[in-house]
C-alpha cells in the first residue's frame, strides 16, 4: 500500500492548496468590487478633464503652453503601470508586450526611450531588460492616492519641461469587464486634440480665463496629466483583482479535477493491493 499512501498524501496536499486558492478567489472578488467603486468614482473626473483638455488643445489660445506644442520626437517617455504582486494571470505580461512593441517602434525611428514605472513587476521587468528607468514607485496597496504618484509623474514632467522628453505616454490595463482587461497606451504630452467632430461642433467656442490664462493653464495641464495617470492606476488595480479572481477560480477548478483523478488512481491502487492480498491468501491455502 506504499503507492496508495503516497497518492493519499498527494490528495491531501492538493486539497490544502485548493483551500488557499478558494480563499484567494473570494478575497480578490471582494477587493475587485471595492476597486471598481474607486475606478467608477474617478472616471467621470478623468473623462471630463480629457474632454476639456481636448477642447483647449483645439482652441486659439492667448497663451500657448509648452504642453500644447508639437515637436520632433527624439526622446520618448513612458509611465508604465503594473502590479506589485503576481498570481494574476497574464495581466502584467500583456501590458509589457504592448509597451515593448510601441517602444520598439520609436527605437526604429531613432528615438531615445526613458521610463517611469509603477509597481514592482514593471520595475523588475524593465530593469532586467536594461531599460533606462528615471523614476519608480511601488507598494501603493489596494487604495492608491494621487499623492503617491506625484513624485514619479513630476520627474517625467520636469524632463518634458527641460526638453529631455518630446513625447509622454501612459501604459496600463483598462478595465472593460470582469473577463476582459485591455492593455492601453494613452498619449499624455503633447496634449492630444479632441478628435470628436460632434464635440468640436458643439464646443467650437474659446474659453475665457480668469484672472490670467498662464497660471490657470500651468496648473490645469499638470493636474490633467496627474489625473490621467491616477486613472490608469485605479483601472489597473481593478484589472488586477479581476484577473486574480479568475486565475484563482481556474486554479481551484483544476485542483478539483486533479483530486478526482488522484482519487481514481488511489482507488485503483487500493483495489490492486486488495486483489494481490486475496491471491496470496488463496495461494497459501491451496498450498496447505
Curated annotation (Swiss-Prot):
Membrane topology: Peripheral membrane protein
Keyword NAD set for record: no
Pfam families per UniProt: ATP-synt
Keywords: ATP synthesis, Cell inner membrane, Cell membrane, CF(1), Hydrogen ion transport, Ion transport, Membrane, Transport
Protein name: ATP synthase gamma chain
Subunit structure: F-type ATPases have 2 components, CF(1) - the catalytic core - and CF(0) - the membrane proton channel. CF(1) has five subunits: alpha(3), beta(3), gamma(1), delta(1), epsilon(1). CF(0) has three main subunits: a, b and c.
Main location: membrane
Amino acid at each position: 500500500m506504499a503507492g496508495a499512501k503516497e497518492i493519499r498524501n498527494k490528495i491531501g496536499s492538493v486539497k490544502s492548496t485548493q483551500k488557499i486558492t478558494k480563499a484567494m478567489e473570494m478575497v480578490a472578488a471582494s477587493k475587485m468590487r471595492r476597486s471598481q467603486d474607486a475606478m467608477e468614482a474617478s472616471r467621470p473626473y478623468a473623462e471630463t478633464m480629457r474632454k476639456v483638455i481636448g477642447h483647449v488643445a483645439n482652441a486659439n489660445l492667448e497663451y500657448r503652453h509648452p504642453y500644447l506644442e508639437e515637436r520632433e520626437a527624439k526622446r520618448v517617455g513612458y509611465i508604465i503601470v503594473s502590479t506589485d504582486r503576481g498570481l494574476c494571470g497574464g495581466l502584467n505580461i500583456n501590458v509589457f508586450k504592448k509597451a515593448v512593441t510601441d517602444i520598439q517602434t520609436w527605437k526604429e525611428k531613432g528615438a531615445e526611450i526613458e521610463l517611469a514605472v509603477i509597481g514592482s513587476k514593471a520595475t523588475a521587468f524593465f530593469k532586467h531588460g536594461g531599460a533606462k528607468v528615471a523614476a519608480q514607485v511601488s507598494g501603493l496597496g489596494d487604495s492608491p492616492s494621487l499623492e503617491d504618484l506625484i513624485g514619479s509623474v513630476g520627474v517625467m514632467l520636469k524632463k518634458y519641461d527641460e526638453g529631455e522628453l518630446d513625447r509622454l505616454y501612459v501604459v496600463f490595463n483598462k478595465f472593460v469587464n470582469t473577463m476582459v482587461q485591455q492593455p492601453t497606451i494613452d498619449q499624455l504630452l503633447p496634449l492630444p486634440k479632441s478628435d470628436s467632430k460632434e464635440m468640436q461642433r458643439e464646443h467650437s467656442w474659446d474659453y475665457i480665463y480668469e484672472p490670467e490664462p498662464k497660471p490657470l493653464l500651468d496648473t490645469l495641464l499638470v493636474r490633467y496629466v496627474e489625473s490621467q495617470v491616477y486613472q490608469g492606476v485605479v483601472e489597473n488595480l481593478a484589472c488586477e483583482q479581476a484577473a486574480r479572481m479568475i486565475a484563482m477560480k481556474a486554479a481551484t477548478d483544476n485542483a478539483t479535477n486533479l483530486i478526482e483523478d488522484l482519487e481514481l488512481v488511489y482507488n485503483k491502487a487500493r483495489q490492486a493491493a486488495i486483489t494481490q492480498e486475496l491471491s496470496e491468501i488463496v495461494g497459501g491455502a491451496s498450498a496447505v
